[in-house]
A protein has these predicted regions:
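Alpha-helical transmembrane segments and immediately membrane-proximal extracytoplasmic
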Residues: 4-370
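Short flexible coil/turn linkers enriched for glycine and charged/polar residues
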Residues: 316, 374-376, 389, 401, ...
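Structured cytosolic regulatory/catalytic domains appended to multi-pass membrane proteins
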Residues: 367-372, 385-388, 422, 429
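Intrinsic-disorder/low-complexity, polar/charged segments enriched in Ser/Thr/Lys/Arg/Asp/Glu/Gln
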Residues: 232, 377-381, 435
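Long, charged amphipathic helices and adjacent flexible linkers at domain junctions
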Residues: 357-382, 457-468
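Acidic, Ser/Thr-rich low-complexity segments on the non-lumenal side of membrane proteins
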Residues: 38-45, 379-405
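Cytosolic Rossmann-like ligand/nucleotide-binding regulatory domains
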Residues: 391-461
Length: 471
């Protein structure tokens, strides 16, 4: 009931946390800083100690994003220009949260670019990199204080993987297609479960009770299904299970993840996805051993499957590849084989027309949030002021409000003539005195205008406008 009540008050904390945080990073939705910070921590602790098959990395990303926003809000009181950095601050906090959760700094940086914003920008890179490095330093200092060791650790420490020999490379082709099908199945199960629960209007309290009771009962007989799955992954890689046991664990884990992640409780899907990928990899590894593959390559198959499965579900292959390298300690071993399987899995899921899971979950959140509201297409003519956040930066380096496109630029050329220009794929530098024609699709025109003002107006002008509107 505690979880249900908190979800009612703070619906932002439902589920993984990553899809919602991505929406905030992209400017599509907002955080309520204190509410989300406290609610996420409390609910994720309950989920963790109850043994739900969910991970802690989703809440870590959400808490990191909230901290980033909170820090930016503090600076806003001192310097109005800080508001223009809001989404960058959230991005930095979120990427740092993921990096610390996995002790995977490079993954945190790539996540911000490939998954969070789905584009490369120097400002996003520098913000996420500086946040990740500083957070990693703090994490290691805390580790030094508690364990006496300053160095990092590997979540699934493994010796270098054996490279698949040339005569067995055909197995990787089959594995890639099979993992792609498995990723599509997982995504479909998640979406269908959510649709069915919503269709039959199952109350949140009932969903939570069913989730906690099922985990409690099944966990008595199958302790390996409890928690996110990091311990399970180590056992699978060590060849501790028969194929029959792997199949049983896979079916139960798939079922429980679908029920728990759609119950409304707080918990991530990153580690559970890796666990499901490992289970599929273990099953296919047993199949390939029956077909003549040597046992020494089994672990390689499991690790590759984890990476490819996550890449197929989330549709972030580079993040998946680097994450597995960082959490296992096998930085280059098996890189070639992993690349082959990830590409095949990715193409398989694309051919099946399955949408990336986090994007699907975010779309559902946005639909519920804006249900009944009218979306308008509006055009703004804005003047770039000297001393503004945007002046001197490239168009692509600005995190424009969600739904905005630069339609036309009106400026004075070297001959003193007024000319119209296009944005040159975001490469054009923004100069004070330019006039930008911005077209936007929005639910809230006033809020959008305020966001644009923070980017293109001098802070003093923004302050004066706020004072006038306050009066």
């Amino acid at each position: 009931m505690c979880i249900r009540d908190r979800i009612k008050i703070i619906p932002e904390i439902k589920g993984s946390g990553i899809p919602y945080t991505e929406g905030v990073m992209r400017g599509q939705i907002k955080y309520r800083t204190i509410h989300v910070f406290v609610g996420t921590i409390l609910n994720s602790f309950i989920s963790f100690f109850a043994g739900l098959p969910l991970g802690g990395e989703g809440p870590s990303v959400q808490v990191g994003g909230v901290i980033g926003q909170g820090v930016d809000q503090v600076f806003e009181k001192v310097d109005p220009r800080a508001k223009a950095f809001n989404r960058l601050a959230i991005t930095g906090g979120a990427s740092a949260g993921l990096a610390v959760a996995f002790n995977a700094p490079l993954t945190g940086i790539i996540f911000a670019l490939e998954e969070g914003h789905k584009r490369f920008s120097p400002s996003i890179f520098l913000t996420s990199a500086s946040s990740v490095l500083f957070a990693t330093l703090i994490s290691r200092l805390l580790r030094l204080a508690t364990t006496g060791t300053f160095s990092g650790y590997f979540m699934f420490k493994m010796v270098d993987l054996e490279s698949i020999p040339l005569n067995n490379l055909w197995m990787l082709l089959i594995l890639g297609i099979l993992i792609g099908l498995a990723a599509a199945l997982f995504s479909k199960i998640q979406v269908v479960t959510k649709v069915l629960l919503d269709k039959f209007k199952i109350p949140t309290l009932a969903r939570l009770i069913v989730a906690f009771v099922l985990v409690g009962i099944i966990g008595v007989f199958l302790t390996d299904i409890l928690g996110g799955g990091s311990g399970l992954i180590k056992k699978i890689a060590a060849l501790d299970f028969t194929w029959q046991m792997l199949l049983l664990l896979l079916v139960v884990k798939l079922f429980l993840i679908a029920i728990c992640s759609n119950s409304g409780t707080t918990g991530g899907l990153f580690v559970p996805m890796l666990a499901i990928g490992a289970l599929f990899g273990g099953l296919f590894g047993h199949l390939f051993m029956a077909m003549g593959m040597e046992e020494v390559y089994y672990r390689t198959m499991v690790i590759i499957s984890m990476s490819a499965f996550m890449g197929g579900v989330v549709r972030a292959p580079l993040t998946a590849m680097v994450l597995i390298a960082e959490v296992t300690g096998s930085l280059m071993s098996g890189f070639f084989e992993t690349g082959i399987v990830i590409c095949l899995a990715y193409f398989t899921v694309e051919l099946l027309d399955i949408q990336p899971l986090y994007d699907t979950l975010l779309e559902g959140t946005l639909y519920q949030l804006h249900k009944g509201q009218e979306r308008k297409i509006v055009t703004f003519e804005i003047n770039i002021e000297d001393g503004s956040f945007a002046a001197g930066r490239a168009i692509r380096d600005i995190l424009w409000p969600s739904g905005c496109i630069v339609q036309k630029i009106v400026k004075m050329n070297k001959e003193g003539q007024i000319v119209s220009r296009m944005d040159k794929d975001g490469e054009r530098l923004i100069h004070a005195g330019d006039v930008y024609i911005i077209q936007a699709e929005t639910y809230n025109e006033e809020e959008l205008r305020e966001q644009l003002d923070c980017l293109v107006l001098n802070p003093k002008t923004v302050k004066i406008k706020k004072q006038k509107s306050g009066n």
